[in-house]
């Protein structure tokens, strides 16, 4: 027995949890029988689908220092392993023949608690210069979705603070709200369709891994995020077991979006204190029709964006937009 074999299993599992990256853990499994057993017990995973589905080692990828260390270590000791381990240790072959769905890729992992899935890129197609950022929560169907969008962003540092104060105090007229409404509705529908598509993509994964407590599905562009907590996933599984498709029916390759109420706030031109001017800035809070908590927009929006230190522009924008007049619209299921 060497020094590495003397390390207790819980310590090794804790190290593997810190690695997290599924691609690296698949390589861990190919090192030895012990690693093959322990790697599948990792509880916190990051699945980057662009890496698993056809990406090569030369593709650009961002690894943590721990993941890089493990990759170097395993490449070094791979040649020293006895023949009994040599054949299954070809991780490139494992990745090449990996199935294409998240559920199949993760079928060998037994104790997933927290899973983050990163998709290749965003889903919403916009005109040049426009941007949409959204966060949606799902159970058996959509629970809520917060969307912030704008047509363009420019930097103007002159008198930014004064301009921002003036814009925040403006009361939008009905004619100003109607102007550009079609575009804002299209942004909203596009975000909801993207969210429901991601929810549908995770259906088998949620059903198979009953031990999961949190699921996050995001994209590498930072456009949108789908979140499911333990209660939401349990609700989804129970609906599937009962065969109750009324609320969780599918259309094409996505979950049906239920009838919703949209709280929409808009500013034709929003000057932020940071000096950034957003044209056609829009904030939309979407909830299924009939949901009682229709007035806690501030809490929902703050949780989605305002506390995000990496996206201070969006946090500042939603804080300013929350001061604008709220217009309520309804939309049928689609």
From Swiss-Prot:
Main location: nucleus
InterPro entries on file: AUF1-like (IPR044809), F-box-like_dom_sf (IPR036047), F-box_dom (IPR001810)
Pathway(s) of this molecule: Protein modification; protein ubiquitination
Residue span, F-box domain: 1-49
Alphabetized PANTHER family for the sequence: OS05G0510400 PROTEIN-RELATED (PTHR31215)
Keyword Protein biosynthesis: no
Ranges in coiled-coil conformation: none
GO biological process, alphabetically ordered: acropetal auxin transport; basipetal auxin transport; cytokinin-activated signaling pathway; protein ubiquitination
Protein name, UniProt field: F-box protein AUF1
Subcellular location: Nucleus
Function field: Component of SCF(ASK-cullin-F-box) E3 ubiquitin ligase complexes, which may mediate the ubiquitination and subsequent proteasomal degradation of target proteins. Involved in the control of basipetal and acropetal auxin transport by promoting the distribution and expression of the auxin transporter PIN2. Promotes cytokinin-mediated cell expansion in the root elongation and differentiation zone, without affecting root cell division.
Family matches, as SUPFAM superfamilies: F-box domain
Protein keywords: Nucleus, Ubl conjugation pathway
GO cellular component: nucleus
Comment block on domains: The F-box is necessary for the interaction with ASK proteins.
Species assigned in the record: Arabidopsis thaliana
Swiss-Prot/TrEMBL induction comment: Induced by auxin.
Keyword Transport: no
